[in-house]
Curated annotation (Swiss-Prot):
This is 4-hydroxy-3-methylbut-2-enyl diphosphate reductase. Its EC number is 1.17.7.4. GO terms for molecular function: 4 iron, 4 sulfur cluster binding; 4-hydroxy-3-methylbut-2-enyl diphosphate reductase activity; metal ion binding. InterPro entries: LytB/IspH. Belongs to the IspH family. GO terms for biological process: dimethylallyl diphosphate biosynthetic process; isopentenyl diphosphate biosynthetic process, methylerythritol 4-phosphate pathway; terpenoid biosynthetic process. Transmembrane segments: none annotated. [4Fe-4S] cluster binds at C12, C96, C197. Dimethylallyl diphosphate binds at H41, H74, H124, S225, S226, N227, S269. The active site is at E126. Isopentenyl diphosphate binds at H41, H74, H124, S225, S226, N227, S269. Catalyzes the conversion of 1-hydroxy-2-methyl-2-(E)-butenyl 4-diphosphate (HMBPP) into a mixture of isopentenyl diphosphate (IPP) and dimethylallyl diphosphate (DMAPP). Acts in the terminal step of the DOXP/MEP pathway for isoprenoid precursor biosynthesis.
Amino acid sequence: MKIILANPRGFCAGVDRAISIVESALEIHGSPIYVRHEVVHNRFVVNGLRERGAIFVEELHEVPDGAIVIFSAHGVSQAVRQEAKNRNLKVFDATCPLVTKVHMQVARASRKGTKAILIGHEGHPEVEGTMGQYDNPEGGIFLVESVEDIAKLGLRQEDDLTFMTQTTLSIDDTSEVIEALKQKYPAIQGPRKNDICYATTNRQQAVRELAQQSDLVIVVGSKNSSNSNRLAELASRMGVVSKLIDDANDIDPTWLENVTTIGITAGASAPEVLVQSVVKRLQELGVTRVEELQGCEENTVFEVPRELRITEVN
């Protein structure tokens, strides 16, 4: 048996930045540091930060007045920002800059009174934060997850409409929804470039290539990670058995029966150490070769806030 590693895989620039913000805040300010929601959707990462003194909460009422709080990479609503200000909380914002870009699109629509349609998954924290950027009662923001949802929209063709998307969606599914929106509302406006982020796009393209060469695709990522789920779904759609796992402990040896090539990738919030532990476990189960796809190079870097930049002194 052999392993083929997808490339690119694992951490993206937004996740790197979010984790660095929590780590730097702990180093500079000490614990406790409060984090609203899991800073990224990965159990291994969150547990590691928790051990270092980060306290993860779901709502700001769990944070003492005047404390330091970090907003997760998924972003928050304007109401949450205002609550933090009212509570005199010291905020470090780990929202991914690519999510912030979508927030700005929604805020612009809100100011103009343009009705906005967000393509995304209901209940996902990124969606909640993005919809929370719209505060104009004369307009409105509406969530659709599928082509079927479009028929339920009570909007008119003559309405001033715009759309935007969650950053971690399936490229194929989103393209279908956008096309259906344009058919129903020919005058609808949208971003010049798809809001799905570069990392999501690159990892889905890598899985396409991986699935063509594999009998089994293993995606390393947490169950609540949107982009990890999309990777597993994509491999399945291509006719390959796919498994989404947190770590090597989730591997079932029976998966390897009649398998000669195992493809491995990782969601944007899964660290490389987990991938390597999966490789090691599979080698114990009989894998003899490890190869890696050439893929594309990613060199995007997002800076942490200035006051959290740690300068090494020689």
